[in-house]
Amino acid sequence: MATSAKRRTSKPVLAPIEAPVPKGKSQDYSVSGALMSEMPLWARPGYLLRRLHQIHYALFFEECAGFDITPVQYGLLTTLSTNPDLDQNSIARELGIDRTNVADVLGRLSRRGLIERRQGKVDKRTMLARLTPEGKRVTKEMYVSMQRAQERLLEPIPPAERHAFISTLIRLIDGNNHLGRTIFSPKEA
């Protein structure tokens, strides 16, 4: 269902940061470090992560255009495909997003017939969500397009370095997860 993506070729916008480092010293990327204080906006980690997030969204929407599903919605569908009958709080923890946002996403997906909600057996106040047959079909069909977006995002990184890149992102999240507005705590982590 994804449209064929036009691949743009462009020259690098940003050059790698290469500051002179005195012999026997390591680069200091701490906030108070000299190198960090001299970094322009486009070289700061937070700015770069935000920009990479924008690029990921653009790639996702380009590859998955025919499905009319957002990355957060696809994350929720994927979560329910491996963990059916989750309540709103569990979904929020799995995705690392706010409960209120989960309720909104569940409502949108329910109106499209991709998920269904039912009352919990143990706690009747709890509503559990699961994929409908149509939700399962869309989630499965979207996988190839989503995977293509991920591959395009990582394309500039040599294959031998991709694991290290992902590992570094995980370390940053693990080390700072407690500082987020919501806590990301997936079952499989």
Model-based region annotation:
Residues 1-67, 189:
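N-terminal leader segment of winged-helix/HTH proteins
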Residues 34, 38, 42-45, 49, ...:
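Alpha-helix initiation/capping motif
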Residues 40, 47-50, 54-101, 112, ...:
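N-terminal helix-turn-helix DNA-binding core of bacterial DNA-binding proteins
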Residues 24, 97-100, 119:
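Short linear motifs centered on Gly/Pro in flexible linkers and helix caps
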Residues 173-181:
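A short alpha/beta connector and helix-capping loop motif
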Residues 6, 57, 85, 107-174:
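Charged, amphipathic alpha-helical coiled-coil/dimerization segments
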